[in-house]
């Protein structure tokens, strides 16, 4: 991208986030600040918030152009000449292919990331991401292997597979992992981004058992330890599934450690239901916690549910973070 945009020193590209309403607000705040500091610059806004709410950004006088997530892959085409339209955002669900590109910028590090898929077919009630990224689109296996080969030739020792919903890789996530490990037997460390507990099958457990170069830390997107809250979130696992999964992995890899994302104060969550999350952390042996107080996101079903007071959400998040700090005790 830097090569494509070389010579355009007066261009500012803002890649926005839409995960929460607060993230979107901060994006708008950043755009205003950039305009004040760069009055003559051309400001192009793209990314997830631009895809979900293009009109909000187009109405900002500080913004010159709004591009959707698909259009940003061809950003040089849209900024090379003046355009009559200020907003160019296509329907993200109309795209069924994945743009091939190698993620760069890992110079000086041991670990590099390879994105294996984009989008998500699930509709968790708190999440706007599918409307920003579209449905699941998997990168061709040959392209993934090519990228890994190139990164290994550059001297990287750790490869981390990532994606919006990496476990939904088609035709098979476990099959892809097996192919990578068979193709690169001397790969020092294969790691994973966030993993969906509902999608990890016995084939994956067997791979963890067989290949010592699978990194023994596994990060799951659990979100809650209460089955009713999980159901209202439209998650596909139960607390029992999580406990069993951790036990299975630990049985074949005693050195395994686990981390997870958790949302505290999801709509309708009671004190007892929150306590089930606290208990799950201990029962499953989860030691690295990414804890977030629930944040309403307009356009999601959860935003229409009865809300937990903000101060209660923050207090529960504080309690769970403290629990995480003592997990290794």
What are the roles of these predicted feature ranges?
Residues 269, 285-286:
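Contiguous mid-protein beta-loop-alpha structural module that forms a pocket-lining wall or clamp
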Residues 227-232, 298-305:
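A short acidic, helix-capping loop that chelates divalent metal ions and anchors anionic groups
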Residues 14-17, 65, 134, 195, ...:
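Short, flexible active-site loop motifs that bind/organize anionic cofactors or intermediates
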Residues 30, 112-113, 192, 229-232, ...:
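Residue-level recognition of specific faces of alpha-helices
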Residues 43-44, 52-53, 152-271:
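Conserved SAM/AdoMet-binding glycine-rich loop
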Residues 1-162, 167-170, 218, 240-248, ...:
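Proteins enriched for Cys/Gly/acidic motifs involved in redox and nucleic-acid/cofactor modification
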């Amino acid at each position: 991208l830097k090569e494509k945009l070389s010579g355009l020193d007066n261009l500012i590209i803002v890649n926005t986030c839409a995960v929460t309403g607060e993230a979107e607000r901060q994006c708008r705040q950043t755009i205003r600040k950039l305009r004040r500091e760069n009055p003559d610059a051309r400001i192009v806004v793209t990314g997830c918030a631009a895809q979900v709410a293009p009109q909000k950004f187009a109405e900002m006088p500080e913004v010159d152009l709004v591009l959707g997530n698909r259009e940003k892959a061809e950003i040089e085409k849209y900024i090379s000449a003046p355009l009559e339209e200020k907003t160019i955002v296509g329907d993200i669900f109309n795209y069924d292919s994945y743009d091939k590109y190698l993620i760069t910028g890992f110079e000086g590090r041991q670990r590099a990331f390879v994105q294996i898929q984009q989008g998500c077919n699930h509709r968790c009630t708190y999440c706007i991401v599918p409307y920003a990224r579209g449905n699941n689109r998997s990168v061709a296996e040959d392209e993934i292997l090519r990228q890994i080969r190139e990164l290994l030739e550059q001297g990287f020792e750790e490869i981390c597979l990532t994606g919006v919903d990496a476990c939904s890789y088609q035709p098979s996530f476990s099959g892809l992992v097996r192919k990578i490990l068979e193709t690169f037997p001397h790969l020092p460390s294969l790691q994973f981004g966030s993993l969906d507990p509902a999608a990890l099958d016995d084939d994956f457990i067997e791979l963890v058992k067989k290949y010592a170069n699978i990194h023994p830390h596994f990060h799951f997107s659990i979100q809650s330890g209460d089955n009713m809250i999980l159901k209202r979130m439209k998650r596909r696992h139960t607390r029992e599934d999580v406990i069993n999964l951790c036990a299975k992995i630990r049985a074949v890899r005693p050195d395994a450690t686990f981390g997870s994302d958790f949302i505290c104060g999801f709509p309708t969550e009671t004190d007892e239901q929150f306590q089930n999350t606290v208990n799950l952390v201990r029962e499953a042996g989860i030691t690295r916690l990414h804890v977030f107080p629930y944040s309403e996101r307009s356009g999601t079903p959860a935003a229409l549910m009865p809300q937990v007071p903000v101060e209660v959400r923050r207090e529960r998040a504080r309690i769970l973070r403290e629990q995480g700090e003592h997990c290794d005790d």
